Each structure stands twice: as structure tokens, then as C-alpha cells.
Regions:
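N-terminal sensory and localization modules of signal-transduction and trafficking proteins
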Residues: 1-10
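Amphipathic alpha-helical segments and their boundaries
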Residues: 17-70, 89-90, 111-131, 183-193
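Juxtamembrane amphipathic/coiled-coil helical coupling segments that flank
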Residues: 38-53, 71-78, 104-112, 137-201
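Extended, amphipathic, non-transmembrane alpha-helical segments
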Residues: 69, 99-103, 130-137
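Extracytoplasmic/periplasmic helical hairpin
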Residues: 70-93, 115
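Alpha-helical segments in soluble extracytoplasmic regions
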Residues: 82-110
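Short, charged, amphipathic alpha-helical segments
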Residues: 87-98, 118-129, 151-162
């Protein structure tokens, strides 16, 4: 009878040990899975940060800076009477047009490759259309300036053409704000997952 009791007790201990071992195994697998998923999420968000949101924001900032310089050069052209200075302004404007076109192409490629970035496509297209309209008016402004019709050129720059430029900058600002939110979210997600991995390492240790 005593032997039977001992056998039953041993079986209970073995059962408890097996349950414990299974629990440890399941918990270990769970922690490994959490760490793996977190690592993948970190990698995905780092790619978004380095390949989408950061370069897109950089391009938007460059566009804002270059278009502002473009407008400054137009004003400089209006107030100058020296032919050499006016020619220099025209050359700078042409150079800026080329740089703006290149930066715009880079931004378009980034947006086309990312589904979230494509949500800003409508604002981007409106901004592009506004810029093309403004750029087309630039030729007329410079022509009037060359003909010593500065008053007409200034009226054009501060009137309808300015409204077009303002519409362009407003859409760029909307895009920049949207992309900044996405960048901040990607950084937050990467940081949270990093903390999770740290907790998993501590728990596993």
C-alpha cells in the first residue's frame, strides 16, 4: 500500500514537472516570437524612415527653399537696371528651375513607390500644377522687367501670380505636415519595439 502511495506521489511530481517544462517551453517560444515580430517591425519602420519619409521631407524642404530663392531672384530682376546683373538673375532662375525639376522627380519617385505616401498624391498634383502655372508666368514677368515695365511686372507678381504661388506653398506645407506625422509614427513604433525586445531579453534571462 505504501509503495502504491509513493508511485502515485512520484507520478504527480513527474506530471507537475512536465507541466512546468511545457509552460517554460511555451513561454520561451512566445518570447522568441514576440522578439522576432518586433525585429521585423523595427526593420520595416527603419526602411520607411530612411527610404521614404526622411528623404521625402528633405525634398519638400529643398523645394520650399529653392522656390523661395526663385521668387527672390525675380524681385531682384525687377529692381535692377544693370544688364549684367539682370542676366545673372536670369541664369540663376534657369538653374533653379532645373534643380526644382530634379528634386520634384526624386519626390515623385518616392511617393510612387509607397502606398501611404500616395495618399498625398492629390495635394502633390495640385502643387505641381500651381508651380507650372507660376513658372510659365515667370517668363512674362522677366520680359516686362527687361522692357523696363517694372510696375506691370510687379503688379503681376503680387497679384494673380502670387495667389498661384501661395496655393503651391500651401500644398507643400500640407504634404510636409502629413509626411512628418508618418515619420514620427514610424520612429515611435521602432522605439516601442526596441523596448519590447529589451524586456523580452530581460525576461528570458
Amino acid at each position: 500500500m505504501e509503495k502504491i502511495k509513493k508511485c502515485i506521489a512520484n507520478l504527480k511530481v513527474e506530471g507537475k514537472l512536465k507541466v512546468y517544462q511545457m509552460t517554460v517551453l511555451v513561454m520561451t517560444l512566445f518570447l522568441v516570437l514576440v522578439a522576432l515580430i518586433s525585429t521585423l517591425v523595427i526593420r520595416s519602420n527603419i526602411e520607411k524612415i530612411t527610404e521614404v519619409w526622411s528623404p521625402a521631407l528633405e525634398d519638400l524642404q529643398e523645394l520650399e527653399t529653392m522656390t523661395a530663392k526663385y521668387r527672390i531672384k525675380q524681385y531682384q530682376h525687377l529692381v535692377e537696371s544693370d544688364d549684367a546683373v539682370m542676366t545673372s538673375c536670369e541664369e540663376e532662375i534657369q538653374k533653379l528651375e532645373s534643380q526644382i525639376q530634379d528634386t520634384d522627380a526624386k519626390l515623385e519617385a518616392i511617393m510612387s513607390a509607397n502606398s501611404k505616401a500616395q495618399k498625398g498624391q492629390d495635394d502633390y498634383e495640385v502643387a505641381n500644377a500651381a508651380w507650372e502655372k507660376y513658372r510659365a508666368a515667370s517668363d512674362e514677368i522677366l520680359k516686362l522687367s527687361r522692357e523696363n515695365k517694372q510696375q506691370e511686372a510687379a503688379k503681376l507678381m503680387t497679384g494673380e501670380v502670387y495667389e498661384v504661388y501661395k496655393a503651391f506653398t500651401e500644398k507643400l506645407t500640407i504634404l510636409r505636415d502629413e509626411f512628418q506625422v508618418e515619420l514620427d509614427q514610424a520612429k515611435t513604433m521602432a522605439n516601442v519595439c526596441t523596448i519590447i525586445i529589451f524586456v523580452v531579453i530581460v525576461a528570458a534571462g
